[in-house]
Each structure stands twice: as C-alpha cells, then as structure tokens.
Design a protein with these regions (language model features):
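Beta-rich, blade/repeat-based domains predominating
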Residues: 2-22, 27, 45-65, 78-83, ...
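Short coil turn/linker residues within repeat-based beta-strand modules
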Residues: 34-36, 89-91, 122, 132, ...
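Short consensus segments that form the blades of beta-propeller domains
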Residues: 73-77
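Residue-level detector of beta-propeller blades
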Residues: 92-95, 138-141, 181
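Short loop/turn segments immediately following beta-strands, especially the blade-tip
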Residues: 127-135
C-alpha cells in the first residue's frame, strides 16, 4: 500500500494478518489480506514509540518488536530508552529489554526457547531465554561483530536447524546455535533482512 509509512520489519501473525513496523508513523500496524489496516501499537505508558524496526510473533500470539530511534530526530524521542517490547494477546504492552542502544533485528530459535536480538550500535547479537510468561531472562553475548568494521547486524532469521542468519553490509553471516561463525554468504547488494520460502530456502 502507499504510503507505507516507511515500513521496515514485516511478519504475519497466527491468523495471517500482516504486522508492519512503520518508521515514519512511529507505530506497528496490522492489516488483513484485503488491505484494511489499523494501528496495532503506537505508544507505551502514554508516550509515542520511537520508530519500530522489526517484529516477530510467538506461538502464544505475543508480539515482540524493537524500537530504535532511527526514524526520528533526537528531540522527538519521547521514550526514555530504545526498547524491546512485548504485546500480549490481551493487548497489554511491556518493555522487556531496555539496555540496548539501537535494537534492530530479532528472531526466535526453532523451539522458541531463545530470542536473539541484535544491537546495531554496539555491533553484537545477544541471546535471551524466553520464560513461560513471555519475559526475557539470562541475557548473554551470542556474537560480537565489533571487529568487522562495516559489519553492522540488521535483520535476522533462524533456520530449522537453529542456525542464525544475520544480514549486514558485507552479506549474510551464518552462526550455529552455539554462536560459532559458520561463514559469510556474499550477495550483490546490501541486504537489510531475509526470509524463508516454503521449500526452506
């Protein structure tokens, strides 16, 4: 649709509706297959979000998204941090992580026991255990990319084997579930995200 509100991260929820992180509109929108859309979330504790960047949906229907300040000027920032948020099925919104500088891509492990989140400012990827109540615990370094000059992590996806694919200016980094670097997939352009087809490719 046009205008798109500078949409970035996209994903489908469990009923096939499209969630879109709209930088320009400072919100996450939700749309049905016919194109009818509405605001899913645009504020936390009465203050506007920064500029939502990427979004994932848990099998419980909880929605997690990152909210860096990329799409706004510093003086427009109303939130006290660049947070990672969870919207529960009942509509309650919670800030689950508040110590990132610029949270960007995020992806679940195949069994949803781990949520990976990257910080483009610090050039690293962290892993968090996902508790039964949806909270994130035991945050730890998964991959430190700060030695790779232009290697700023962006959108991420996890395959069926649990390997993590992180896009960046150099291509697509691939890591196994233990955080070991497996290799770089070179591409002709600068990828901002990636996705899987029905055949797993």
């Amino acid at each position: 649709r046009e205008p798109s509100g500078n949409s970035n991260g996209l994903t489908l929820n469990r009923t096939g509706r499209l969630l879109a992180c709209e930088h320009g509109n400072r919100r996450v929108s939700i749309a049905d297959i016919g194109g009818t859309e509405e605001t899913f979330v645009d504020a936390y504790e009465g203050k506007k979000l920064n500029s939502p960047n990427d979004v994932v949906v848990h099998s419980s229907d909880a929605v997690y998204f990152t909210d860096p300040p990329y799409g706004i000027k510093p003086e427009q920032m109303e939130q006290p941090c660049a947070g990672v948020y969870r919207v529960d099925p009942d509509g309650a919104i919670r800030c689950v992580i508040a110590d990132f500088e610029k949270p960007n891509g995020l992806a679940f492990s195949p069994d949803e026991s781990v949520l990976y989140i990257d910080d483009s400012h610090h050039q690293h990827i962290r892993a968090f255990d996902v508790a039964a109540d949806g909270s994130l615990n035991n945050g730890r370094m998964f991959a430190d990319l700060s030695d790779d000059g232009d290697g700023v992590p962006d959108g991420m996806k996890v395959d069926q084997e649990g390997n993590l694919y992180a896009t960046n200016a150099l291509g697509i980094w691939v890591y196994n579930p233990a955080g070991d670097f497996l290799g770089l997939i070179s591409v002709p352009e600068v990828p901002a995200n990636c996705a899987w087809g029905e055949d797993g490719r």
